[in-house]
Structure formats: structure tokens, C-alpha cells
């Protein structure tokens, strides 16, 4: 499934605060960029979730966020779909599911004309913060943030965000930077990179400490 992304849809994202214009796709021949170094707490890819299972919810304890996860694909122009409301997030279903080997991506809005979106404070996460993704199988895939970066949309590193780097990663993506009132959109994207640190049955998740 990663080949679909690499070959046809290495994109900058069009998550908007108030507008609807989308940045152009990155050409498929674009030079891959180096992925961030994995966290020292990351687990080996052999411990990744073995079978694909769609994510059903995302929890970010540091931000007091717990939200259902929908499914997103591609628009007709090759850009990535975005959630229909500011309080929703969506998993890019043409990539791996969270916990599998590869880079899973979940997108959400930073805000709207009505106020903050679900990822309004995403940029404030720091390395070591935890992300928990509950899968349809009942498994909870647990991730630790490794880095947070902001990219101008024209320089969005799609291969780095969407491509497989041999580990089980989860990227969260939203808008950020300067808001352009003429176009009605933000000029940058915020990306939170995280690595898988473990899995647990959903029923046992509340018994597992999220922070050391």
C-alpha cells in the first residue's frame, strides 16, 4: 500500500483553518528525504501489529484529546482528503494501519471560523508524549512522540511523512504557521512523528501507565 503513496500521491496536505484551497501534489520523482531518527524507546518492527485493522479512536493524554478516527483517501486531483469537520480526525487508508510496519498517518484540523479544532494544540507536543490508537481488532497501539516539525506547504516532505522506513511509525498532521487571509488557509503543516512502543488489548489499556 505504501507503493501507492510513493508512486502516485506524495502530497503536501490541504488542511485548512478557514479556507478550502489545496496545495499541488509533489511529483512522484521527488528525491526522498531522510526520516527522523527513531526514538530510543521504539520497538523492533518484529513486534508490530501483524494484521491490518482500521483505527477507531485516537487518544492524546497530554492534550486531553480522545476522538473517533474516520477514514480518508484521495481527492480526484490526487490530494489527500481531509476530515469534514474541525472536531474529526481521519486515517489515510491507502497507507498502513497504526502499529503495522510503515508510516500510518492521521490528519485533523487546527481550527475553523468557529474556534479551535481537534489538533489546535498539536504543535505543543514534545518528545516522550504518548499517543494511543485503538484498532477495530480491540488492540491499542501505543506510540511515543519522537519529534515535532513545521513545514511550509511547498516544501512538505511527503516521502518522509508517508514513506516506509522499516519501523512502525505514526504521523499526526495538521495546519500551522502563518494564516493567509487572502487565500483563507495556513501556509504550513505541523507534523508530529511518533514510534510504536507497545500494544495492549483495549480492555487492559487503562491498567497500563502512559507515562514513565
Question: What is the role of each PLM region?
Answer:
Residues 9-212:
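Solvent-exposed, non-transmembrane regions of membrane-associated and secreted proteins
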